[in-house]
């Protein structure tokens, strides 16, 4: 017996014929065709002819249009987007109608492709087999077109080229979305926040930010997502699949976005530039989020506490503060994190990976933020300026601390002696005077430090390493701050000026010591005799009297002294 073809069970009407049908006849037609589609879907029909497959899809789409009574009667055919049969035009899809029903669980779908995907969720049941398998990564596909599209992710082929800017794309849909960025057309507007989007699918995904809907759930860990692409990427964290490889170094990634971000380390390409400050980005979405820094726009508000955010990922991470969720767990030490970037940086503590390398001096960093900050030591860039005095800084935190000099704010108070400090670093350094303890200890001499960076700088006093060299005179230094201060001896810059007498200083320590001459403050007190000093160096010299330390030796006769003034006085005896 011959197999039944699609054309044997389908029925078509011309536009004129359809107009002559009574409402009851139209309803009967719709019921029959719906039943036909259900039957074809349930037997798992495989389409040998791609034209028939396309016809099946078009018929399915247009059947949904006929499920309502709104037909294109009395309208020009050119106004209609889809054709049900060669001569019959119809209106848009009727909302809420889902003619494709799963025979296993009864769930219904708008599209046959959606039903196909769903059927695979039932173990051991496939609506269509997947005859097209990728040789690169092993992924299989039901349709040849889908397989051919996937292959481009490996070959790098981008057949869709924008005539406006020359940008190329692997897939047609992102290409269409990109074209709309040139014409500025964004016909789909969110009723909640007014945001306009270029396509209806983007609007549907965006609306889930407001509703909180996350229809895509991971079967492995139960985590839910608002869009299908996110769950596909997430599932790779369980399977270990990394289909996107860097052509430069071979490193593999779970998402296309990740490999593009990584490629910056090789080529530095950032095509999207901010008109306000000139900062460049890899993706237009990153630029849009950045632009909100200038506009002050924060469209995402937390329903729990009312805090607003510039981007959707920030609010998602913030909400975990309320829920306590920490989905990223380190396999090495068990520590959990609420945000993926923090988790990735933490993992590098175990692996020792430092992917961001400075081209100037070769120093490597585990975080891109540390790398960018370090680059400023070479360029001399100081983008953060104090509006009060005009002083500029490399880092935003330094500016924040500096501002306290103007406001007088000292938020860090010592519980031992009630002394207050403008910065956490100064406070921690002070606490050592009480406890004598620090978390980072030098293996050579036992000296303790609050910060690992301070320990590294100190260790150079033992190794003799001086990686920072002055280009003017060739003098080398163990610490980046030392070379910055040293450069002022060449430029003549004296940024620390006394408001009392106008005297200016190169070094902040000299300036602070000078200011105590005006205030009378003497913070360094000798425990032996109670004598107080305004300068730490003076205090150190004084303590040598009590412990009989005499580190300064005369090269002529070998006599030792505790003070440099005493040594100088002694030297005059030899010079007579």
Curated annotation (Swiss-Prot):
Zinc finger (C2H2-type): 100-122, 132-154, 160-182, 188-210, 216-238, 244-266, 272-294, 300-322, 328-350, 356-378, 384-406, 412-434, 440-462, 468-490, 496-518, 524-546, 552-574
Domain of life: Eukaryota
GO cellular-component term (any): nucleus
UniProt keyword terms in alphabetical order: DNA-binding, Metal-binding, Nucleus, Repeat, Transcription, Transcription regulation, Zinc, Zinc-finger
Main location: nucleus
Any single biological process term in GO: regulation of transcription by RNA polymerase II
Subcellular location(s) of the protein: Nucleus
Domain KRAB per the UniProt entry, residue ranges: 4-90
GO MF entries: DNA-binding transcription factor activity; RNA polymerase II cis-regulatory region sequence-specific DNA binding; zinc ion binding
Family in the record: Belongs to the krueppel C2H2-type zinc-finger protein family.
Role according to the record: May be involved in transcriptional regulation.
Descriptive protein name: Zinc finger protein 791
Organism: Pongo abelii (Sumatran orangutan)
Organism classification: Eukaryota, Metazoa, Chordata, Craniata, Vertebrata
């Amino acid at each position: 017996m011959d197999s039944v073809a699609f054309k044997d069970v389908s029925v078509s009407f011309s536009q004129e014929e359809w107009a002559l049908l009574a409402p009851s006849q139209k309803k009967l037609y719709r019921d029959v065709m719906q039943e036909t589609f259900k039957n074809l879907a349930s037997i798992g029909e495989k389409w040998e002819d791609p034209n028939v497959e396309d016809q099946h899809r078009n018929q399915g789409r247009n059947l949904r249009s006929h499920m309502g009574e709104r037909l294109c009667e009395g309208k020009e055919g050119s106004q209609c987007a889809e054709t049900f049969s060669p001569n019959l035009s119809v209106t848009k899809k009727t909302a809420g109608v889902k003619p494709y029903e799963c025979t296993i669980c009864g769930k219904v779908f708008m599209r046959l492709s959606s039903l196909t995907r769903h059927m695979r969720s039932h173990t051991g049941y496939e609506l269509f087999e997947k005859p097209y398998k990728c040789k690169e990564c092993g992924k299989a596909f039901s349709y040849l077109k889908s397989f051919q599209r996937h292959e481009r992710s490996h070959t790098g082929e981008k057949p869709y080229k924008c005539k406006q800017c020359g940008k190329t794309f692997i897939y047609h849909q992102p290409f269409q979305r990109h074209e709309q960025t040139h014409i500025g057309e964004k016909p789909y507007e969110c009723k909640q926040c007014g945001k306009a989007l270029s396509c209806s699918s983007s609007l549907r995904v965006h609306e889930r930010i407001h509703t909180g809907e996350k229809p895509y759930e991971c079967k492995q860990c139960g985590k839910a997502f608002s869009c299908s692409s996110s769950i596909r990427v997430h599932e790779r964290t369980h399977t270990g699949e990394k289909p996107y490889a860097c052509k430069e170094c071979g490193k593999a990634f779970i998402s296309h976005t990740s490999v593009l971000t990584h490629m910056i380390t090789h080529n530095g390409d950032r095509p999207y530039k901010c008109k306000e400050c000139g900062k460049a980005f890899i993706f237009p979405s990153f630029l849009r989020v950045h632009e909100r820094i200038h506009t002050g726009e924060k469209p995402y508000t937390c329903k729990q506490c009312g805090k607003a955010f510039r981007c959707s990922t920030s609010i998602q991470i913030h909400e975990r503060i309320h829920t306590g969720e920490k989905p990223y767990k380190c396999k090495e030490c068990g520590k959990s994190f609420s945000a993926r970037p923090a988790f990735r940086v933490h993992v590098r503590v175990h692996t020792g990976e430092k992917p961001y390398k400075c081209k100037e001096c070769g120093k490597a960093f585990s975080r891109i933020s540390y790398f960018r900050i370090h680059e400023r030591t070479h360029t001399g860039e100081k983008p953060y300026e104090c509006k009060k005095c005009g002083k500029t800084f490399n880092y935003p935190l330094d500016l924040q601390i500096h501002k306290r000099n103007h406001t007088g704010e000292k938020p860090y108070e010592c519980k031992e002696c009630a002394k207050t400090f403008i910065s956490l670093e100064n406070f921690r350094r002070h606490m050592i005077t009480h406890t004598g303890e620090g978390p980072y200890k030098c293996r050579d001499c036992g000296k303790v430090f609050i910060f690992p960076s301070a320990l590294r700088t100190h260790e150079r006093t033992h190794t003799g390493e001086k990686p920072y060299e002055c280009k003017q005179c060739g003098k080398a230094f163990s610490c980046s701050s030392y070379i910055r201060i040293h450069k002022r001896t060449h430029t003549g810059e004296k940024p620390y000026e006394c408001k009392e007498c106008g005297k200016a200083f190169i070094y902040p320590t000299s300036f602070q010591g000078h200011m105590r001459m005006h205030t009378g403050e003497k913070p360094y007190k000798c425990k032996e005799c109670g004598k107080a000093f305004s300068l730490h160096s003076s205090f150190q010299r004084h303590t040598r009297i009590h412990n009989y330390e005499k580190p300064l030796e005369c090269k002529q006769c070998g006599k030792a002294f505790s003070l440099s003034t005493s040594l100088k006085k002694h030297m005059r005896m030899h010079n007579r």
